[in-house]
Amino acid sequence: MQSHLAPLACAAAAGRAGGSCQAAQPEDRRVLRYPGTAVMVTCPNRPLVPRPLLTPGGSRASLALCAFVAVPQRIPQPLLPAYILLMLPSLVVDMALPSSRLLRSIKPIQPASQVVRKERNPNPNCPQSDPLMKASSTSFLSHTYLINKTRSTTRKVEEHSWFTCTGAKYFAIPLAERNTKRLTKRSTHAQLLRGKQDGSEWVVPRSSASSNVLYH
């Protein structure tokens, strides 16, 4: 049901961004079917909605439509048109306001297959046993998203592909493997790996080098 709305969202996003609308790829539709994974995007006057909306090239505006596309699973099919009409005015307002908090809070996103490696200031003195050395050998995205850290708070998650020994920056990828339940500090506290960067504390689940997530 959600994937049927993706073309509509894409068209509206293209109009807002001044670009053209491209149909979602099969892997994008696969991601759309898993509401428990991917990014949590803050939508005004609505709860946090997990939805990556991976259009080719990673449209920022299409991400902004997450709340409109992520139709609650419990809505019966006959009521879907009424839900769309109910959400449409709010959607138009969100997209029309240049200062919309929805648009300001979202940055571009790339499909996992287009991940790029950007490593800065590597420290050659790091011991090879340092887990960060192992993690740094993987390619990572370099964008900022909003992740639901607890039920009532939203924190920034910033992704990096570089590190230092004394002030380590950690990683958050791949996008499709992120599980919002696993991103909760409360549930992963015993597995956290702590580090310091620029005077701030960063915490990372110790699960694997390809899915480390940092909290700020």
Curated annotation (Swiss-Prot):
Keywords on this record?
Glycoprotein, Secreted, Signal
Give the main localization category: secreted
Looking at the record's lineage, which domain of life comes first? Eukaryota
Signal peptide location in the record?
1-23
Annotated compartments: Secreted
* Tissue note: Ubiquitously expressed with higher expression in heart.
Instruction: Identify the glycosylated residues.
Output: 148
Q: Can you quote a single GO CC term?
A: extracellular region
Miscellaneous note of the record: Candidate gene for the Cat Eye Syndrome (CES), a developmental disorder associated with the duplication of a 2 Mb region of 22q11.2. Duplication usually takes in the form of a surpernumerary bisatellited isodicentric chromosome, resulting in four copies of the region (represents an inv dup(22)(q11)). CES is characterized clinically by the combination of coloboma of the iris and anal atresia with fistula, downslanting palpebral fissures, preauricular tags and/or pits, frequent occurrence of heart and renal malformations, and normal or near-normal mental development.
What is the designated name of this protein? Putative cat eye syndrome critical region protein 9
